[in-house]
């Protein structure tokens, strides 16, 4: 029997993305977004008592040539972002549920981690965004026929039972070599 005093405590973190542009004359068409260098598994220990708190033991880094796992936020969606005032929903209708963990942002300004490959080796987190960016009709990234990739440092602490909402503001980013 479940009574009204029983509370459900969610053990995962909910993550949602939205996007807008930095300038009103900018248009972005997003194809894919991935979060790199996140831990992909762990063990959750249930609380010993009904009013207790469980705990996570997050696993080791996945074995891969990229240094860590990645989470796909959107894939093949072709989301159009064309406002610098109203954020466009990317994943609110399909939020991600992830293992609570600390994400260390890619430190682009440091020599030891100034490229994407070095960031992977140090397990520093970033977003990989495949998109087209236009400003006043001129392509800044990609073309009418192709998409380009930008990388954005991404760090936070995902807390169990909490909803984390991120609004991406397109107007910058880095190449895989850490160049703005």
Predicted regions and their residues:
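Extracytoplasmic cysteine-anchoring/structural motifs
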Residues: 1-180
């Amino acid at each position: 029997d479940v009574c009204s005093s029983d509370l459900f405590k969610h053990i995962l973190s909910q993550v949602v993305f939205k996007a807008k542009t930095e300038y009103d004359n900018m248009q972005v068409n997003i194809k894919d977004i991935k979060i790199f260098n996140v831990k992909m598994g762990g063990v959750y220990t249930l609380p010993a008592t009904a009013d207790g708190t469980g705990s996570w033991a997050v696993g080791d880094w996945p074995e891969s040539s990229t240094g860590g796992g990645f989470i796909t936020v959107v894939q093949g969606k072709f989301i159009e972002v064309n406002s610098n005032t109203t954020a466009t929903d990317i994943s609110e209708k399909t939020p991600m549920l992830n293992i609570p963990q600390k994400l260390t942002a890619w430190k682009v300004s440091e020599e030891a981690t100034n490229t994407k490959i070095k960031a992977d080796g140090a397990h520093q987190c970033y977003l990989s965004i495949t998109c087209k960016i236009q400003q006043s009709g001129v392509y800044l990234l990609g073309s009418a026929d192709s998409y380009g990739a930008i990388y954005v440092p991404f760090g936070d602490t995902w807390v169990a039972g909490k909803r984390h909402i991120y609004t991406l503001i397109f107007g910058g980013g880095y190449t895989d070599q850490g160049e703005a």
